[in-house]
Amino acid sequence: MIKFTNENLIRGIRMTISAKSRHLALGTDMTRKFSLSCRFLNKANLTEEEKELLNEPRARDYVDVCIVGGGPAGLATAIKLKQLDNSSGTGQLRVVVLEKSSVLGGQTVSGAILEPGVWKELFPDEKSDIGIPLPKELATLVTKEHLKFLKGKWAISVPEPSQMINKGRNYIVSLNQVVGYLGEKAEEVGVEVYPGIAVSDLIYDENNAVKGVITKDAGISKSGKPKETFERGMEFWARQTVLAEGCHGSLTKQALAKYDLRKGRQHQTYGLGIKEVWEVKPENFNKGFAAHTMGYPLTNDVYGGGFQYHFGDGLVTVGLVVGLDYKNPYVSPYKEFQKMKHHPYYSKVLEGGKCIAYAARALNEGGLQSVPKLNFPGGVLVGASAGFMNVPKIKGTHTAMKSGLLAAESIFESIKGLPVLEEVEDEDAKMAMFDKEATINLESYESAFKESSIYKELYEVRNIRPSFSGKLGGYGGMIYSGIDSLILKGKVPWTLKFDEKNDGEILEPASKYKPIEYPKPDGVISFDILTSVSRTGTYHDDDEPCHLRVPGQDMVKYAERSFPVWKGVESRFCPAGVYEFVKDEKSPVGTRLQINSQNCIHCKTCDIKAPRQDITWKVPEGGDGPKYTLT
């Protein structure tokens, strides 16, 4: 790995790792104590010394490619770039991956079932006796599968569309573990991988082209004052910036708006995936079994479905995906998931077992209609930042990685003839070189996507997800999807559209609905939300600025605007107990919003589902957030 010479960077990385390590070693209680740190954001009375410290020049580094996000797409991009560089270039390209989690994979959530094709493409020389170039302990071949419609206590078999067939083809994994392995492969080929580094902003030049990124300042108190641990964020200047943040990334959100990348496309629509990993009794374990379910517990007007995957040594992943375009503000995706586990189809597997992990994450469901323009001046979008998930397959890892390979090939062709950065020692000379070089706008990547297997795959299934949003709801969607998948294969002259309202705007007033009475958790099969959050390992320093923003951080005013209409929908769509409405006699509506930011597991649902689109998720300090395992 190439070493940085900048002392500020080295010191900052060490302090970030040290701070997070102290938390892990002490086993700090992170979820049972609600934090009030987001109630008010006080204006700090800064001294001149503190002002000078907060505004000191940032350390700067120059790289060829800066990749924000160390998930499957980001790491695939990085690995392919260095493979090309090592085989056909100088071998000296600086490819840097910045990941906000303290460890690679620590904030990765997926089902997951992998298709092996893209792995063989990325690692063509890797020998494997299991059919996919992964360590055999990380992958379990699907040997049996079911598709069921749940109704009452029944589980009714349903014909499987061809794109959903996994048996004998695909592999059950913990994507959390797989990403850790990918990180090792990236370092082997010379990628610089830096976990625990949060990226807060893009760098723009005078022509509004992206020239790199800025990492977040660390060690600032919730009042805005620098603490003893303060470290100024730094700048990474790059010839090409790759946004691989996953679904609904904060920098991606900036780029989409600034460059109008959704022009001529539909808005994105999302789902919320919630999952647990269980150790089950040997008699309930069926290694290689994968099942998907429709129907119960969701009503006809809510899109979604459940799954259970048996993998590894006695482990079962159980989960539910709920489409976030639901209209009823009383729906709680978390409680729907807990309810689902009591259906006999799931409970008979989980009884006598032990839940060992919990996770939740928003995912893209818009498909081809919602894929934005992929390139902008100085950068590109890859993976879930763009939204390549194949919804009928319930898979996005293979398309995310494939997009990374396409991006890497386009980037390499555009920069392979440029001066080698490592041969320019003077920092001023590097700056001058970057100023002179023309901005790279990779139209070739957009073109490559339209000719790729990703486009073909998404085109074929483009009408399936929006068919569930029609007047006939879930039943109509199932009928259309069956015809489209089994007979038409997407070869129709029309493309269905989603509702013009986004997932937040589509919420209807609570007055149109009755409150939903969910069963209380039994503590055996189903759990209260704080017990689940305690299984995520999430952590945020209580004394840091709140990363969840509402207008003016005015919790009373927020409640005035939201609570009378939607009756606390924020407390129901969040799968981590972050948002509460608590009594407040001074409030005109008798309540105020309370944000328990320490519980946040970075699922991004609040930034998507807030009905007035007035909750903004900002990146917290590097290393903060969940510390997932087996997810």
From Swiss-Prot:
Cofactor(s) the record lists: [4Fe-4S] cluster; FAD
Domain annotation 4Fe-4S ferredoxin-type: ranges: 591-620
Documented EC number(s): 1.5.5.1
Membrane-spanning ranges: none
Compartments in which it is found: Mitochondrion inner membrane
Binding site for [4Fe-4S] cluster: 574, 600, 603, 606
Reaction(s) this enzyme catalyzes, per UniProt: a ubiquinone + reduced [electron-transfer flavoprotein] = a ubiquinol + oxidized [electron-transfer flavoprotein] + H(+)
Alphabetical list of SUPFAM superfamilies matching this protein: 4Fe-4S ferredoxins, FAD-linked reductases, C-terminal domain, FAD/NAD(P)-binding domain
Coiled-coil stretches: none
Keywords: 4Fe-4S, Electron transport, FAD, Flavoprotein, Iron, Iron-sulfur, Membrane, Metal-binding, Mitochondrion, Mitochondrion inner membrane, Oxidoreductase, Transit peptide, Transport, Ubiquinone
Co-factor note (free text): Binds 1 [4Fe-4S] cluster.
GO BP: electron transport chain
Top-level lineage group: Eukaryota
List of residues binding FAD: 65-79
Family: Belongs to the ETF-QO/FixC family.
Job of this protein: Accepts electrons from ETF and reduces ubiquinone.
General remark: Present with 3320 molecules/cell in log phase SD medium.
Protein's name in the database: Probable electron transfer flavoprotein-ubiquinone oxidoreductase, mitochondrial
Species the sequence originates in: Saccharomyces cerevisiae (strain ATCC 204508 / S288c) (Baker's yeast)
Gene that encodes it: CIR2
